[in-house]
Amino acid sequence: MATRIKPKSNRIYDEDFYAWSREQADLLREGRYAELDLGHLIEEVEDLGGALKRSVRSRIRTIVEHLLKLEHSPAPDPRGGWYDTVIAQRSDLIDELTPSLRREVEADFARLYDRARADAATSLQKHGEVAAADALPTACPYTLDQITGDWWP
């Protein structure tokens, strides 16, 4: 039985993704479009967009979770860490939140809030703050501009 040999770009893609990505970039720069590994290239471009979307959604959820805890938790000790987390997530979010991703976040904002609220409630309950967890609002009390800006509760 004859062994089918994979094209060079498929072997590189499977064995050394970094080398494959550099090769594809070189081919694009040189205008050698017929040599591109289009199937994998399309897949990777789509995956990049998906990864960025997941990152933005995760950052927003984390910010909202920590804003809720800052607003509703009476505990003094963890506050500094919550502030630091919000600051770091906002800083990274600035680089990632494009106009099209902002529209997608706005369209799915209620669901994002529900998950952030659940995360905050779980964290508060875990630390014995059941009343604070129960007091979390069912609808998001923050605008997207407040979440992404310099606003604090």
Show where each model-derived region lies.
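Surface/interface-facing alpha-helical segments and adjacent flexible terminal/loop regions used
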Residues: 1-153
